[in-house]
Design a protein with these regions (language model features):
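Active-site core of glycosidic bond-cleaving carbohydrate-active enzymes
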Residues: 1-16, 20-24, 74-171
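Acidic/histidine-rich catalytic neighborhood
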Residues: 28-91
């Protein structure tokens, strides 16, 4: 997430020298995720684990009493990783860097991240599975990071996902 702020600063200023200074941080963060992400067993997606969706909890199927927060690859994590990998690739291209092994790994990993998914109610899913939320009116909508402040979801480029975000907010 912090690398996103650095990247936004570069986009605003267009300062190539600044980009050269922040690239090692972006590269390091990307390498960290490449080295710590795991295969999700159901679909083989590359995900963060263990993780959680900020401050939100869900119920395990068949258990109406528990409040679980630990999961594999929550949507916000996937959005942050997708953004970081994409920005790191773009920064390397702008800087004309030839870090082929890393760049190839980032491109490959991007293709292995879980896609955004819409639940049976038409909302953007917060987790890989369609869990019952403990508090459906929970104040956090971190899984909409890809809509804002990120740019992975937009009404013009991904209208179905934008409608799912709207449904999440309207709930």
């Amino acid at each position: 997430w912090l690398c996103a702020h650095l990247w936004e600063h570069y986009l605003y200023t267009g300062d190539i020298r600044y980009l050269g200074h922040i690239y090692p941080l972006m590269r390091g963060a990307a390498k960290f995720f490449l080295s710590t992400m795991v295969r999700e067993p159901k679909n083989g997606y590359l995900v963060t684990a263990p993780s959680s969706s900020p401050e939100n909890t869900f119920r395990m199927p068949g258990d109406k009493e528990s409040a679980v927060s630990i999961c594999l690859g929550p949507t916000m994590d996937t959005q942050l990783v997708r953004e970081l990998f994409t920005n790191t690739l773009e920064a390397a291209e702008i800087l004309t860097l030839t870090d082929k092994p890393l760049l190839d790994s980032l491109k490959s990993a991007l293709n292995q991240l879980p896609p955004h998914t819409i639940d049976s109610e038409g909302r953007l899913m917060e987790w890989l599975e369609e869990y019952e939320e403990v508090d459906p009116q929970h104040r956090h909508v971190s899984h909409l990071y890809g809509l804002h402040p990120g740019n992975q979801i937009s009404p013009t480029l991904t209208p179905e996902l934008a409608r799912a975000c709207r449904a999440t907010l309207d709930r």
